[in-house]
Amino acid sequence: YVEPQNAIAFLPWDPTKFIYQSQRDGYNHLYLFDADATNMKGETYNSANGGTYFQAGKVKQLTKGNWLVSDVLGFNTKRKEIIFTAVEGLRSGHFAVNVSNGKISQPFENCKESEHSGMLSASGTYLIDRYSTKDQPRIINLVDTKNFKETANLLTAESPYEGYQMPSIETGTIKAADGTT
């Protein structure tokens, strides 16, 4: 595959800056670029996967860690935040990153083993969070993006396996021959 895999997104409150997703550090993360033509001198850098990339203009890495951004849902223009979905192993969740200071709304440790998808309101204030876990087939909540707390449960689906004897699902890790991975 060749980057960019995702379209760039200009900040609604500042048309000279845009968000670019890249795996240049080994994980898909968000980068803030300044599109001001006076800052477009470029340099070539080495990426984590052994390739190189050319970078023009000022850049700031907004998200960082051993997890990846899976989807940019949109913006909260009032708080100048980017709302996104991120994945780490079997855990996923929705987050906001402040463009000014790079602060992320909540720690990844708050996320449970689950698969999330979302739809953001036009204002970026509320989010329809759809998710499932190994024990729960579907939950849909209305979430306030200020604190990512549920404000209303819209659906908690009944398990289609109710009344059946089901195996328990367990996850774990196995070390490779090198003993570290």
Where are these regions (language model features)?
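Peripheral, non-catalytic segments that deliver or gate enzyme domains
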Residues: 1-181
